[in-house]
Structures are given as structure tokens and as C-alpha cells.
A protein has these predicted regions:
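Residues that flank catalytic or metal-binding motifs in active/ligand-binding sites
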Residues: 6, 44, 52-54, 74-76, ...
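Core segments of cupin and vicinal oxygen chelate
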Residues: 2, 13-56, 94
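Vicinal oxygen chelate
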Residues: 14-18, 71-135, 146, 157
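Acidic/histidine-enriched, glycine/proline-rich intrinsically disordered or flexible terminal extensions
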Residues: 142-160
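Conserved catalytic-core motifs of GNAT/GCN5-like acyltransferases
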Residues: 31-39, 102-104, 126, 143-148
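Short, charged/polar surface micro-motifs in flexible loops or helix N-caps
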Residues: 51-55, 63, 83-87
């Protein structure tokens, strides 16, 4: 039986495709691979490379100003795994990325911009830091620890 081999891409509907392209290409360092167009020549999507097997698609002409809040149904965030969190976060901020941190006010969680990067230990045992793209999509940067809950679960699954 064929198996799923990975997550191919994340697709985002964005309000200003050039602003989002600048963020993901210049700040996050995802090179543009190609553009697809409708028959009338208008832009359908921009395809960016995260890794050789993982991509980001930017679809233009989003109608709302920002992504839905973290309590809304739908995508909460997407996570990018990294090797060295301090160095990577510092490089992203140096290229114009805005560091963010989770706060709670009146029982409502929100990811808000902060002056300097915040690196925390997640409940799963991994180190994490957060930022938002120009449309408010939440991005987690995660350095996976050798004994994190995910790695423990992988070892258990392999032993079955």
C-alpha cells in the first residue's frame, strides 16, 4: 500500500502578494521557484522552496486584513524546524523579521510583537520562538531536542 511520504506544501492566501513574497523570500530566505498564471495572464500563485521536498505557495488577493485569530477554527500556525534556534532567530530578525510572544489578556491568547526574540521551552520539550508574516499568519520556529516527546514517540513506534 502506498504511504504518505511527507507534507508537500503550505498554501497561504495573502492580501498583498509582493509584500508577502518579500517577507518569505528576503526575511525567511525561501527562494522563489516559479509563478503560475491564469489563462488571462493574472497571477495564480507564487511557489517558494523551503526544502527540496517542502514548499510554500502564496495565492494573491486575500480579502481580509489579517489571518484569523488563534481561537478560530482552521490553521493555528505552521512550524519550521531549525538546527540552532538562537542563531536562526537572530538572523531572521536582522533581515527584518518581527519577533513575537504569546500573551493572554482576559482569557484570550494572542501572539504579539515584542522588542527582542523570546525563546521558550515548549510542553513537548523543544525550544521555540515565534513570529508573524505580514498577514498575521503565525510561524513557530522549533529546535527539536533529542529527547523531546516527538522523538520519544518515534522511538516507541519503531519498536512496535
Amino acid at each position: 500500500m502506498p504511504a504518505i511520504t511527507g507534507l508537500g506544501h503550505v498554501a497561504l492566501k495573502v492580501k498583498d502578494v509582493e509584500r508577502s513574497l518579500a517577507f518569505y523570500r528576503d526575511v525567511m530566505q525561501f527562494p522563489e521557484m516559479m509563478r503560475l498564471h491564469h489563462d488571462d495572464g493574472s497571477l495564480f500563485l507564487i511557489y517558494l522552496r523551503i526544502t527540496d521536498t517542502q514548499y510554500l505557495e502564496l495565492f494573491p488577493d486575500g480579502v481580509d486584513d489579517t489571518a484569523p485569530g488563534p481561537d478560530h477554527t482552521g490553521m493555528h500556525h505552521f512550524c519550521l524546524t531549525i538546527d540552532v534556534i538562537e542563531q536562526t532567530v537572530d538572523q531572521i530578525v536582522a533581515r527584518g523579521g518581527i519577533p513575537c510572544a504569546w500573551t493572554t489578556e482576559n482569557g484570550t491568547s494572542a501572539l504579539r510583537p515584542v522588542d527582542k526574540p523570546v525563546i521558550t521551552d515548549g510542553l513537548d520539550g523543544n525550544r521555540q520562538s515565534w513570529l508573524q508574516d505580514p498577514d498575521g499568519n503565525r510561524i513557530e520556529l522549533m529546535e527539536m531536542a533529542p529527547d523531546c516527546l516527538q522523538m520519544q514517540a518515534i522511538r516507541k513506534l519503531k519498536d512496535m
